[in-house]
Amino acid sequence: MFLTDPISDLIVRIKNANQRKHKTVEIPHSNKKEAIVKLIKEEGYISSYSVEGSKKTDKRLLVTLKYKGKQSAIVGIKRVSKPGLRVYVKSEEIPKVLSGYGTCIMSTSKGLMTDKEARKANVGGEIIAFIW
């Protein structure tokens, strides 16, 4: 299956699994997807992730979602920059998600990072997604 936007596929799979209260979700692997999942893990929205499979074509990300009782750690996740409409911001214009309670995942010249890291490094870039 050919995907025009693999990042949106990642976000939708996590969102759907989260809404259905699944413990884990399986996602086709790519280095960029793995970097995004790593940031989500570091921010505390998922419990863990692992890379399954040995061949490049068989690799999958196995993401374990995080719950506190019946409440999910992820309240919402939204794709911002899309292939048809890219969203770029300068370092001074980086938005705060829910007044700082959420996280903005950005692709910068220094790699993928959160909004807090981008402000600290004083770099702008493309806004990939919001998560809260």
UniProtKB/Swiss-Prot annotation:
Q: State the protein's purpose.
A: One of the primary rRNA binding proteins, it binds directly to 16S rRNA central domain where it helps coordinate assembly of the platform of the 30S subunit.
Query: SUPFAM superfamilies given for it?
Result: Ribosomal protein S8 (SSF56047)
Name any Gene Ontology BP term: translation
Q: Name one Pfam family in it.
A: Ribosomal_S8
Family per record: Belongs to the universal ribosomal protein uS8 family.
- What is the recorded name of this protein? Small ribosomal subunit protein uS8
Q: Which domain of life is it from?
A: Bacteria
Keywords carried by this UniProt record:
Ribonucleoprotein, Ribosomal protein, RNA-binding, rRNA-binding
* Entries under NCBIfam families matching the protein: PRK00136.1
* InterPro entries recorded: Ribosomal_uS8, Ribosomal_uS8_sf
Sections of the chain in a coiled coil: none
Q: How does it assemble?
A: Part of the 30S ribosomal subunit. Contacts proteins S5 and S12.
Give the GO molecular function terms.
rRNA binding; structural constituent of ribosome
